[in-house]
Amino acid sequence: MENIVITNTSGGGGGGVPSSSTDPPNNTTTTTATASAIDLNMSLSPFLSSPSLSSPSIQSAKKKTIEDFIIGKVLGEGSYGAVVLGTEKETQQQYAIKILEKKQIIKENKIKYVQIEKEIFCKSNHPNIVKLFFTFRSEQCLYYVLELCSQGDLLHQIKKVGSFDYRSCQYYVAEIISGLEHLHSLGIVHRDLKPENILMSSDLHVKITDFGTGKILPPPQSSQQQQQQQQQQQQLPTNSSGNLSSLLNNVNNLSVSTDLTQQQQNRTSSVDSASTTDSMISPNLQPTTTTTNNNNNNNNNNNNNNNNTAAGSNTNTNTNTNINTNINANINNIKTTEIPKLTRNNSFVGTAEYVSPELISNKETSTDSDLWALGCIIYQMASGRVPFRGKTEFLTFQKVSNRELVYPINMNPVIKDLVEKLLVIKPTDRLGSSSTPGGFDNLKAHPFFQDFNWSSLSNMSHPPPPIQPPQEKIIFDGDELFSPSLDCTTPRNNNVDENHQQNSCNNNNNNNNNINNINNNNNSSSNNISNSNSNSNSSNNLNISNGNLSTPRSSSSSSSQQPTQRSGSSGGSRDGGSSSNNISKWLNNGENVIYQGLVWKRKGFSIKKRQLILTDTPRLIYIDPKKMELKGEIPWSDSIKPKLKSNNNFVIKTPKRKYLLEDVAHNPQKWVDSIKSVILSSGSSN
């Protein structure tokens, strides 16, 4: 493993709380990028000397910077950035460091959600939720120093064994429920709960992570607050000026600040008044849009008009005209990228295979949405397959909305009953719903947990049961029973903050014995859950496993924190497989793929996952494997030189730049050899 020490952090931005001496003031007239960068620094300032709720082990008030860590290999991807292995120089303690580029956050208009993720980490103090230890920043990046989970993710564990036996399934579902119950008690909805976002600690305990799409629900209103809100609504005019005023309020709320901030801080202090952190979202942050002095005056006029209207004052034609004019002025100055903020609470987030029906239909999400995802996870742990999968994302959504799922013919009836009670279309009817008396207690009382000791979860030193496959193989109607192996699947990677790539299948060497068990043991014990190696390739992600372009790797080496991809093997032509069809639009006529695979592309503080493609023309192009967009090309010349750097890393030197790359498949030598081979062949042809 190659260790890379990052030294060129900014002197004033490496850590600590922003002060007037280091942070520029918030000017009302500024450019979008400058204002956003200032807001981002203020919103995501590092911790004070006191630890956060999530981090009881923070030792001192010393301000951390990236210079305090040795940066190692890439572990994976979070919602808005790469995650790398970081070793603290002073203690040699290892962490997972999430690196977020400021300019990327601003460009994608994700400031609000980065703030929310940090706030959720700070609020959460539970053994089954990943801990946040430090946050700090440099001039270019924000850094989250997180608990390292060295055993990968739950999906990796499922793929190792095919499916979980009854005892291991019971234990790990209980740990997920324990962490989920804690989140929901704080009013937190994960909204993207899935096996890839459930990590495994070194001692194989569940750690829920990745809150980039999470949501913090407002605290329930008292009857007095509800009456006040109704009175305010009755005071609003019903004419067009009232509607325009309402729109103006929405437009003015397009800011990185939020009224929810103080409520969240109050909730945090009520959990532990001794724990103090700095304000995570500054109440005085300015909108990220570019404004002028005239527009600022318009904003002031709008606010005055709105206040008068809310107070029940009389409005005349001139006032209505001013409101119309000012609203149009504000709307014209709003960037189109900010409009989604108006409907964020109703927008689609999550991953298609685990998303709940109410999110697809654009209804308001709630904690009950996570219960649907829990049902999908239990189904997958018990069967090895996701319950809902279509050939396209749209068809998957249709299956979810219509609840079209098929159970294995020999699925344990107790587990099936639990899944049935969670995968319910109406959110409030799901087992464990907060809208029903009992809530999570009802879920814990299900017969699946009949002999489970819930109090044992508080003792994390107690080892969990071994993760192992059941005694009999699970069978779906229509499976080819005598096939030596079934296709392996991972869920499609539809979210911006996903961190897992397709890995190879497990082969079942005991199919004939398993088939005999199915025939002879129709009334098998409820403790036996079948094994399955089934899943299918995503149609949305690059697939390089077809034809002679790929060589499968053993699934035992996969990990969510070290995402792996089957690397391409030398193949002189496109063979018409799905891989070739997916990338053909970026190839010229007669151009053939020589080698391709996933790499981590490093440039300064930026770490991006890319699909690198070597062709015979020759060319080296790289593609965003999620968005399926061409991102760039490494310029080819007679002086291009590939060089091996370590077991994972290689460098491609061009006259103007060095490209530092890390092979996700851990075979950088294959890249070096392939490029050298093309260099020789192109030289001989010339």
Curated annotation (Swiss-Prot):
Feature: compositional bias, Low complexity: 18-31, 222-257, 268-279, 288-321, 503-568
Annotated organism of origin: Dictyostelium discoideum
Single GO term (MF): protein serine/threonine kinase activity
Region (PIF-pocket), start-end ranges: 100-144
Gene that this polypeptide is encoded by: pdkA
InterPro entries on file: Kinase-like_dom_sf, PDK1-typ_PH, PDPK1, PH-like_dom_sf, PH_domain, Prot_kinase_dom, Protein_kinase_ATP_BS, Ser/Thr_kinase_AS
Chain residue ranges for the region called Disordered: 1-31, 211-321, 481-584
Catalytic activity: L-seryl-[protein] + ATP = O-phospho-L-seryl-[protein] + ADP + H(+); L-threonyl-[protein] + ATP = O-phospho-L-threonyl-[protein] + ADP + H(+)
Domain annotation PH: ranges: 593-682
Alphabetized Pfam families for the sequence: PH_3 (PF14593), Pkinase (PF00069)
SMART domains: PH, S_TKc
Gene Ontology cellular component annotations, sorted alphabetically: cytoplasmic vesicle; plasma membrane
Residues the entry annotates as binding ATP: 79-81, 98, 147-149, 153, 196, 210
Record PROSITE patterns: PROTEIN_KINASE_ATP (PS00107), PROTEIN_KINASE_DOM (PS50011), PROTEIN_KINASE_ST (PS00108)
UniProt entry keywords in alphabetical sequence: ATP-binding, Kinase, Nucleotide-binding, Serine/threonine-protein kinase, Transferase
Domain Protein kinase: 69-449
Family: Belongs to the protein kinase superfamily. AGC Ser/Thr protein kinase family. PDPK1 subfamily.
Comment text on domains: The PIF-pocket is a small lobe in the catalytic domain required by the enzyme for the binding to the hydrophobic motif of its substrates. It is an allosteric regulatory site that can accommodate small compounds acting as allosteric inhibitors.
Biased segments, Polar residues type: 258-267
Designated name of the protein: Probable serine/threonine-protein kinase pdkA
